[in-house]
Amino acid sequence: LVDALERVHAHWYGQLADGLDTEIGSRGHQLDPVEAQQLALARILLLDPKVVVMDEATAESGSAGAGDLEAAAEVVTRDRAALVVAHRLDQAAQADQVLVMEAGEVVECGTHEELVARGGRYTDLWAAWSKGRA
């Protein structure tokens, strides 16, 4: 457990009142959104599944915790098949394959580089996202 928590950058566990015996939840220590996500990612490491599905794993983190959660998510998905739902295009750009969906339908599929070069919907999304980051 300690190894899994360390691998997902959940260093806060050492500051809990009763260490790893601390009760978590409504009757115990309240986790903030980043801590809750780190704990969920540590649990994935403990289970060691072959396939991981993550839906907006960094959505609630805010800018301060996003980097830690992105690094932790990378650790969890390394050497596993992973389906990652992400609205942040910097996360999508790191994927082996990107599926672009509109109205519940896949409208484009390819690597980040292929999709940017294609000039379709992903290209428009990437240009708008990149402009907003400049």
Report residues per predicted region.
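The feature encodes the conserved inter-subdomain "coupling" segment
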Residues: H11-G19, E23, R27, L125
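Conserved ABC ATPase "signature" region
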Residues: L1-Q15
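C-terminal boundary and immediately downstream tail of ABC-type ATPase nucleotide-binding domains
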Residues: H9-A10, A117-A134
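Short loop/turn and capping residues at structural boundaries
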Residues: Q15-L16, E35, A103, W126-A127
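ABC-family ATPase nucleotide-binding domain "signature/switch" substructure
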Residues: A4, D21-G119
